Amino acid sequence: DNILYSGETLSPGEFLNNGRYVFIMQEDCNLVLYDVDKPIWATNTGGLDRRCHLSMQSDGNLVVYSPRNNPIWASNTGGENGNYVCVLQKDRNVVIYGTARWATGTNIH
């Protein structure tokens, strides 16, 4: 899957995958985007702790937490509560999208 929804987490070793690209929460607390085997972006939090997790929060902030729930990295995109998604796109970019502003209202409950 290539989407992390509000309220969801990535535990150590879990990842978003979109073909050749992988966005992984590593065991060493580093969040890394890989193009095949080549790291192309990272939070540079490796070695700060072990077994951290990534959280897509309902305020739109993407945060790496230590096992004691201390934030060690954040996207600093927190705002109003809503529905947000973190998407690993086909163009290799990882993007946080926010709450929908309009809909037809024709969804089925």
From Swiss-Prot:
Top-level lineage group? Eukaryota
PROSITE patterns per the UniProt record, alphabetical = BULB_LECTIN
Disulphide bond pairs = 29-52
Task: Provide this UniProt record's keywords sorted from A to Z.
Answer: Antiviral protein, Disulfide bond, Lectin, Mannose-binding, Plant defense, Secreted
**Molecular function as annotated in GO:** D-mannose binding; protein homodimerization activity
- The transmembrane segments are none
Q: In which tissues is it expressed?
A: Detected in bulbs (at protein level).
Q: Domain Bulb-type lectin: where?
A: 25-109
Question: InterPro entries, alphabetically?
Answer: Bulb-type_lectin_dom (IPR001480), Bulb-type_lectin_dom_sf (IPR036426)
Annotated alpha-D-mannopyranose binding sites: 26, 28, 30, 34, 37-38, 41-42, 44, 57, 59, 61, 65, 72-73, 76, 83, 89, 91, 93, 97, 102
- Subcellular location, in the record's words? Secreted
Regulation affecting activity: Strongly inhibited by alpha-1,6-linked mannotriose. Inhibited by various oligosaccharides of P.pastoris mannan including, Man(alpha-l,6)Man-alpha-O-Me, Man(alpha-l,2)Man, Man(alpha-l,3)Man-alpha-O-Me, Man(alpha-l,2)Man, alpha-1,2-linked mannotriose, and Man(alpha-1,6)Glc, in order of decreasing potency. Weakly inhibited by elsinotetraose. Not inhibited by maltose or nigerose.
Where does this chain mainly localize?
secreted
Q: Name one GO cellular component term.
A: extracellular space
Q: Alphabetically, which GO biological process terms does the record hold?
A: defense response to virus; regulation of defense response to virus; response to virus
Explain how it is applied in biotechnology: A two enzyme-linked immunosorbent assay (ELISA) (with NPL bound to the solid phase and a Galanthus nivalis lectin (GNL) as detector) can be used for the quantitation of human immunodeficiency virus type 1 (HIV-1) coded glycoprotein (gpl20), and possibly the quantitation of free gpl20 in medium/sera, and screening for compounds and antibodies which interact with gpl20. When labeled with fluorescein isothiocyanate (FITC), can be used for the detection of very early stages of apoptosis, especially UV-B-induced apoptosis.
Quaternary state and partners of this protein?
Answer: Homotetramer; antiparallel.
Q: What does this protein do?
A: D-mannose-binding lectin which binds alpha-D-linked mannose. Displays a high affinity for alpha-(1-6)-mannose oligomers. Able to interact with both terminal and internal alpha-D-mannosyl residues. Displays antiviral activity and therefore may contribute to defense against infections.
**General remark:** Binds to the mannose portion of the glycoprotein (gp) 120 of HIV-1, and inhibits the attachment of HIV and rabies viruses to susceptible cells. Has a significant inhibitory effect against various viruses including HIV-1, HIV-2 (IC(50)=0.6 ug/ml), and SIV (IC(50)=0.5 ug/ml) in MT-4 cells. Also inhibits human CMV replication in HEL cells (IC(50)=1.2-1.6 ug/ml) and inhibits syncytium formation between HUT-78/HIV-1 and MOLT-4 cells (IC(50)=3.3 ug/ml), and HUT-78/HIV-2 and MOLT-4 cells (IC(50)=4 ug/ml).
Q: What is this protein called?
A: Mannose-specific lectin
Question: Which organism is this protein's natural source?
Answer: Narcissus pseudonarcissus (Daffodil)
Which lineage? Eukaryota, Viridiplantae, Streptophyta, Embryophyta, Tracheophyta
